[in-house]
From Swiss-Prot:
Protein's name according to its UniProt entry: Zinc finger CCCH domain-containing protein 11A
Residues modified as Phosphoserine: 108, 132, 149, 171, 289, 346
Transmembrane region(s): none
Subcellular location: Nucleus speckle
Pfam families per UniProt: zf-CCCH_3 (PF15663)
GO molecular function: zinc ion binding
GO biological process: poly(A)+ mRNA export from nucleus
Coiled coil regions in record: 338-360
Skewed-composition ranges (Polar residues): 115-135, 461-473, 698-715
Stored InterPro entries: Znf-CCCH_3, Znf_CCCH
Biased composition (Basic and acidic residues): 308-331, 345-360, 393-405, 431-443, 492-501, 545-558
Keyword Glycosyltransferase recorded: no
Length: 792
């Protein structure tokens, strides 16, 4: 048993249930002894068995009567330190009564009995707790024998304070005696000014009630209610500040509401508005259904359930609570100037929103505001209600179709930013006419918004640019010979971009299939996009007619010498100034239309056509780069950038265009060309193919604008092509990739020599310096640089 350290209180004066696990000292020799060990007090008692107590003893327990002696069982402790008046038997041993005499004062005896009972009860209660709090509790109990219980004095002090508060505020608050003591605490801690501000108002009301009578009190309360409703209505949201502030500390607010209800018991009428007001505030959004004005909120909730996004819910919430509070405060509600202005503003907003139904959020706001204003003015007929329902259904279908088409285009394209711009432009072509007509039929005056004006301007610019783009290529196409646009340094960037866009144009065979694919895809596209695609179809038809007319005259030239001579002559002719000015004008015009053009080019580059063109160009470039001693390969198939082709001579560009067109139209013929190249017949094989497809390439170089518009239309309709056209495009995409990888092996020397000679003859022994384009630059950055160069 532990015999070191301090004594265990329960072992010596009660029963310790811990036994050996008790960290305090259990010593049988010291049982019943009340003498403190002096060595232990000095901290140097190291005896194994010490008969003295290792514990501070403040009381004479021999003078305290034993609690268990008065119990029916009696005291069963052999060494009990308390006073026993009767003799007892413990384990067969006879123990005589205690020799010490108790003090003579009977009152003190009773107190000692009580304290002894307290100690025993506390010892029983805290048997399982740690011994250090045991000692503290014992010391507290022993020291507080003659002191009254600690809970009593604070009660006395609080009562006195309450009495003083009652004396101070009796004239103002009457029965309220305890709320003043509780009121300041929320004011100090939480800053709940609303709660405290409400209370002085109530006290003033009661003071006036005492002085002037009940009628004036009712009038004052009705005025206060009106003021409160105005203040709460002026808040930014329908929920008032009284609701928002008490949330961090709900306790004081509840008590405050209770006091207000108790105050109002003098007059029965104003009690109901107060309670209803707090309930409607706590209900939040549902409070709209509490008032009598329930029809507009129901329609608003229907519009919200149908999935429309409501743009300004706060203002709608504002208006209904104001009406409610007005009806509740008094039977007759006089509208204030602010309310009338707000209603007019809401009606104007509703008119504007009906005209802006092309946009989703405004269209969603339109139905609730319009119905609300009309319901406040007049009752609608049944036919009008039916017309409105049909109108809403049409709007919803239109929005769904828009969302479907935009989602399809977004999922097909890899770069999100570039793809978003084109569908919006295409949609805006057909969109503004229908909603404007509808809005005019509904309301007389049509006020154009800024967005509508911008859309119309963009449409005008686009149409003018398309018409000018059509006229310029026709002017350039007057001479029947094939032209190679060649501009040094400045317009080279734009030319390479145009080459990339022209490659996407197809010869007559593929254009027919593309038109069929466009027609099938038109069925899936919604109304606005049909207009843009149909326009592009008409452009394509004109294009193919022109090609067929020119094809008859151009097929006669089939020899390699004639091709070379034509190219050389056209090269020298193009080096002149008029063509250069025309191209610079085109580029300048393009620079003006940067937002529309860049979005269309982004669409072209990221669509499936772009991939096939790039793969074809890879195949063509690998053939051409054999002629170089140190080829620079800078082609990234994952990111489709037509601009990133390395330095090429003028003839190389022409060859690249021809080979790309051949590969795009006839993958088998291009593969045959590439397979014949190891047998030293590349130059001979290329000639007939070039002569056959010459009208195509010529017309493409002559109408750069048409090809850009056409390719943008193809790119717009490409993600929605049917399954029939899918394999053909994938064929053209996969075959050149394989061929290019195969053809990058060991090139024969004869093919290289042929290319070297051809290029050297055309360039006249001088390869002009070309622009080295940074492949990391974006399409928009290059266009900006081009426009700056042209302006300077």
């Amino acid at each position: 048993m532990p015999n070191q350290g301090e004594d265990c209180y329960f072992y010596f004066y009660s029963t310790c249930a811990k036994g050996d696990s008790c960290p305090f000292r259990h010593c049988e020799a010291a049982l019943g002894n009340e003498t403190v060990c002096t060595l232990w007090q000095e901290g140097r008692c190291f005896r194994q068995v010490c008969r003295f107590r290792h514990m501070e003893i403040d009381k004479k327990r021999s003078e305290i009567p034993c609690y268990w002696e008065n119990q029916p069982v009696g005291c069963q402790k052999l060494n009990c330190a308390f006073h026993h008046t009767r003799s007892r038997y413990v384990d067969g041993l006879f123990l005589p009564p205690s020799k010490t005499v108790l003090p003579t004062v009977p009152e003190s005896q009773e107190e000692e009995v009580k304290t002894s009972q307290l100690t025993v009860q506390q010892s029983k209660l805290s048997v399982q707790s740690n011994p250090s709090p045991q000692l503290r509790s014992v010391m507290k109990v022993e020291s507080s024998e003659n002191v009254p219980s600690p809970t009593h004095p604070p009660v006395v002090i609080n009562a006195a304070d309450d009495d003083e508060d009652d004396d101070d505020q009796f004239s103002e608050e009457g029965d309220e005696s305890k709320t003043p003591a509780l009121q300041p605490s929320p004011d100090v801690h939480n800053g709940l000014r609303v709660a405290s501000a409400r209370k002085p108002g109530v006290s003033l009301k009661q003071g006036e009630c005492l002085n002037f009578g009940i009628k004036t009190l009712e009038e004052i309360k009705s005025k206060k209610m009106k003021e409160k409703s105005k203040k709460q209505g002026e808040g930014s949201s329908g929920v008032s500040s009284v609701l928002q502030q008490p949330q961090p500390n709900p306790g004081p607010e509840k008590e405050n509401v209770r006091t207000v209800v108790r105050m109002v018991t003098l007059s029965s009428k104003p009690e109901e508005p107060l309670v209803r007001l707090s309930l409607s505030e706590r209900l939040g959004k549902r409070k709209l259904s509490v008032g009598g004005d329930s029809d507009p909120p129901l329609k608003r909730s229907l519009a919200q359930r149908l999935g429309k996004k409501v743009e300004s819910p706060e203002t709608n919430i504002d208006k209904a609570p104001k009406k409610e509070r007005g009806h509740k405060a008094g039977e007759i509600h006089v509208k204030t100037l602010e309310e009338i202005l707000l209603e007019r503003a809401s009606q104007k907003r509703g008119e504007l929103q009906t005209k802006l139904k092309a946009e989703e959020p405004s269209g969603a706001d339109d139905s609730p505001s319009g119905t609300k204003s009309s319901s406040s003015v007049r009752i609608k007929t049944f036919s009008e209600v039916l017309a409105e329902k049909k109108h809403r259904q049409q709007e919803m279908e239109r929005q769904k179709s828009k969302k479907d088409t935009s989602c399809l285009t977004l999922t097909d394209d890899t770069e999100m930013k570039k793809t978003v711009s084109l569908p919006t432009v295409a949609v805006s072509k057909g969109q503004p006419e229908e909603p404007a007509g509808r809005a005019r039929s509904m309301q007389e005056v049509h006020i154009k918004t800024l967005e509508e004006i911008k859309l119309e301007k963009a449409l005008r610019v686009q149409q003018s640019s398309e018409s000018s783009g059509n006229s310029r290529p026709q002017a350039e196409a007057a001479p029947g010979t094939k032209r190679l646009l060649r501009i040094t340094k400045r317009a080279g960037v734009k030319e390479e971009k145009k080459c990339g866009l022209e490659d996407s144009g197809d010869p007559p065979q593929s254009s027919v299939t593309k038109m069929e694919a466009n027609e099938t895809s038109d069925e899936t596209i919604s109304d606005p996009t049909k207009l843009a695609v149909n326009r592009c179809d008409t452009v394509k038809e004109k294009h193919t007619q022109r090609l067929q007319e020119r094809g008859a005259s151009q097929k006669e030239k089939a020899a390699l010498s004639s091709v070379r001579g034509d190219e050389a002559s056209s090269y020298t002719r193009v080096a002149g100034k008029p063509v250069l000015t025309a191209v610079s004008g085109v580029t300048r015009h393009l620079a003006k239309r940067l937002p529309v053009e860049s979005s269309q080019k982004g669409e072209v580059e990221t669509s499936g056509i772009g991939d096939s063109i790039l793969n074809v160009k890879c195949a063509a470039q690998t053939l051409e780069k054999r002629s170089k001693v140190k080829p620079k390969v800078n082609v990234k198939p994952s990111v489709v950038k037509v601009v990133s082709a390395p330095k090429l001579a003028p003839k190389r560009k022409a060859v690249e265009m021809h080979s790309a067109v051949i590969a795009a139209v006839k993958p088998l013929s291009s593969s045959s060309v590439l397979q014949e190249s190891p047998t030293k017949k590349a130059a001979v094989a290329v000639v007939p193919l070039l002569s056959e497809d010459k009208p195509v390439t010529m017309s493409e170089t002559e109408n750069p604008k048409d090809s850009s518009v056409l390719s943008s239309a193809q790119a717009a309709s490409e993600p929605l092509l049917p399954e029939g056209s899918g394999p053909s495009s994938s064929q053209t995409a996969t075959k050149p990739r394989r061929l290019s990888s195969a053809s990058t092996g060991k090139p024969p020397l004869s093919v290289e020599d042929d290319f070297e000679k051809l290029i050297w003859e055309i360039s006249g022994g001088k390869l002009e310096a070309e622009i080295d384009l940074d492949p990391g630059k974006d399409e928009d950055d290059l266009l900006l640089e081009l426009s700056e160069m042209i302006d300077s």
